[in-house]
């Protein structure tokens, strides 16, 4: 069964009124706060840790409830950001003279009417079992347990027409990469078993996988997201893959059990939004070109409580990038560059880079006028002097000019960061280059890099709180981004695209 719903929250009309009022004040506010010319070569002194800390605790506090993409909380946080930009003195650069560019995201999930039974155990998706993909299924078959699924284990059992249960086993990479190893292994092995004749696959966690069952399965509850018509909106039928906790192992082993699974799928449409603002350039010709400072305002919202905390605030991911981008805006307002500075806070990044994908497809300035993208993604954790540029080395580097500008600027702030290069390599298990908002721009040959301080143990957990952020580090990375952008924004020539640039996937 497929159900389609078009969801616009009942309180959205009140939000629309607020947005309208903000549009009115944005125009008048900009007229009253035009950037001053200033006398300094740049305005790096406008980037202050006190501003960054204040904004961080506001945006990543419980008031905005984790800013989940497609929710009223994301919209409320977006209005707050736009109001800060108006007060700073930026010009609205979204649709229809506002700070906003609205778009729709489509969500596909497993319905509450879906049923899952193994023997006498009635299981609920999202609680004591998780179905890995929201696909239509109807299975009623004998369950066979095949140990850890080794060739020797499988040789002893006829799996054709059966639901196959197996215990997860295998030592993966370190914790920060284990999640991708876990899901990759489960999906790959399940595909092999289904190809060999299994009609369903049931995974039971081992001790290491169990911690991820408890921490990372909230995304499976949500389902899949995409822009309308995107690949994740397609609803299809397939043999189900089920994930169980380690506590299920003893009863799953029992012989003679029946596996019954009826999966129904439903689809929803939600509003999300990009926030777009600019500081016009001062050069009569170059002001028609833009250097784009990119970030995203959404996170994971309200989810299953961990240690009593159900609000996943996303202080590092990515309130840190947002407050940095606001600080960059203050500097460009104080001292405009020759080229225009464009600031884009992308919505629904956590749902699959949806806001940046939408903006690249429907930019509010001519796409060819964007000379470079500097993306801020998680810049507030780990060692104070460590950082990473995504897009620094081939095949991810698409502009040596832009990368060299960033490397030079790294030596000019008084805090020279030691740059990690491993996470930008194509064989890194996290595939970090492909997971932030610079990517859609790079795919259309716009010079693009991302500044990041990389993952940490609180990534996508309720422990990603503002109290854990190194605001001094955020300030220093912001100044580094500023000097890079200031350089590019004032050069006579725009940075060139590397000849033959092609991503590995």
Question: What are these model-predicted stretches?
Answer:
Residues 14-26:
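Bacterial N-terminal signal peptides
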Residues 31-92, 154, 215, 288-290, ...:
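N-terminal hydrophobic or amphipathic helices/low-complexity stretches enriched
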Residues 65-175, 405:
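Noncatalytic luminal/extracellular "stalk/propeptide" segments of secretory-pathway proteins
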Residues 294, 301, 428-477:
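Zn-dependent metallopeptidase/amidohydrolase metal-coordination segment
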Residues 330, 334, 339, 456-505:
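His/Asp/Glu-rich mid-to-C-terminal helical/loop segments that flank catalytic regions of hydrolases
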